[in-house]
């Protein structure tokens, strides 16, 4: 049973790690906002197939919490992915993959400032290391560029994406008591609706690009694998080995994203990438190890939906 759970969690994080690579491969084949809209349009169709009976059961509870569920989709699904797919137009998929490791750090900071969650010395050290790794990546190995406020446009957009997903995760503490299919379906529908104005804006600028054959392949990948399959496998993994242990597998997302960027795109893995990976993953590991037991999460949020 544990082996099956591990396989499910590895495949889930592999799918999520491939999202930034898919965004990079989409350049020249489909525009960012078009990809965001079509991804969630297709995802809604796929999710509806497995969710409609459950949605009817959960509707009384979901209706009372509709604004919150729609907020999940607008921030965690639309804004995150729109910024990510825009970011890879200007920076490497490796950078985008590594920078996502900053999400746990920002979640920690938001929890501390708004909810005064416990903090340990190990957590301070760990998240300091993670911050250094993300900063090193965003600065392309030259921290002096940050001091001069010369941040690459793509890395800047990715920082917005990280902030959006961190806020989404914080809001999950108020998630309604509904089935996981309902918790996927309504935010996905909200993502489809809120990504439409972004698509219209892109069309108005004359920057929209309808997908070609490769673009459609990428769109179907993002709609099926990161949006649906990864979510299902992650939930199965959590059910089998518990949320805390399953949450550790999320740290594989930047690793898989980096490896896939090298193998599939042929991006060059530079020395600062290696240092940044060691800093971010090492920092997360130290922070997790030093987490006060009382503040351990019961349900870690699935990343990079």
Regions inferred by a protein language model and the residue ranges of each:
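Hydrophobic transmembrane alpha-helices of multi-pass small-molecule transport proteins
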Residues: 47, 119-141, 195, 251, ...
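Helix-helix packing/entry segments at the starts of transmembrane helices
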Residues: 36-38, 94-102, 170-193, 223-263
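Hydrophobic alpha-helical transmembrane segments of multi-pass integral membrane proteins
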Residues: 3-8, 34-50, 71, 122-135, ...
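Glycine-/small-residue-enriched transmembrane alpha-helix faces in small-molecule transporters
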Residues: 1-34, 145-174, 193, 260, ...
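Membrane-interface helix termini and inter-helical loops of multi-pass transporters
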Residues: 21-29, 86-89, 138-151, 200-218, ...
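Hydrophobic/small/kink-forming positions within alpha-helical transmembrane segments
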Residues: 17, 21, 73-78, 82, ...
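Specific transmembrane alpha-helical segments of multi-pass solute transporters/efflux pumps
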Residues: 15, 19-20, 48-100, 136, ...
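Specific alpha-helical transmembrane segments that line the substrate/conduction pathway
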Residues: 34-45, 81-123, 161, 243-263
């Amino acid at each position: 049973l544990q082996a099956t759970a591990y396989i499910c969690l590895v495949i889930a994080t592999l799918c999520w790690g491939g999202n930034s690579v898919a965004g990079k491969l989409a350049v020249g084949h489909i525009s960012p906002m078009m990809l965001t809209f079509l991804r969630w349009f297709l995802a809604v169709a796929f999710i509806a197939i497995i969710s409609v009976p459950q949605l009817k059961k959960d509707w009384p509870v979901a209706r009372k919490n509709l604004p919150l569920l729609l907020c999940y989709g607008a921030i965690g699904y639309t804004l995150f992915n729109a910024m990510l797919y825009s970011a890879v137009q200007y920076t490497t998929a490796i950078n985008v993959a590594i920078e996502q490791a900053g999400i746990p750090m920002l979640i920690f900071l938001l929890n501390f400032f708004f909810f005064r969650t416990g903090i340990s010395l190990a957590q301070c050290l760990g998240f300091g290391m993670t911050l250094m790794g993300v900063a090193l990546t965003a600065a392309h190995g030259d921290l002096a560029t940050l001091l001069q406020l010369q941040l690459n446009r793509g890395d800047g957009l990715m920082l917005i994406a990280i902030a959006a997903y961190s806020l989404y995760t914080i809001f999950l503490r108020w998630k309604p008591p509904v089935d996981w299919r309902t918790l996927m379906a309504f935010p996905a529908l909200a993502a489809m609706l809120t990504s439409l104005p972004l698509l219209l804006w892109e069309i108005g600028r004359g920057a929209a690009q309808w997908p070609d054959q490769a673009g459609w392949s990428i769109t179907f990948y993002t709609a099926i694998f990161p949006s649906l399959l990864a979510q299902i496998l992650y939930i199965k993994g959590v059910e089998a080995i518990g949320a805390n242990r399953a949450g550790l597998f999320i740290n594989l997302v930047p690793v898989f994203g980096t490896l896939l960027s090298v193998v599939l795109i042929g991006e060059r893995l530079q020395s600062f990438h290696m240092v940044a990976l060691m800093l971010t993953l090492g920092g997360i590991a130290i922070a997790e190890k030093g987490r006060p037991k009382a503040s351990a999460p019961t349900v870690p949020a699935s990343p990079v939906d």
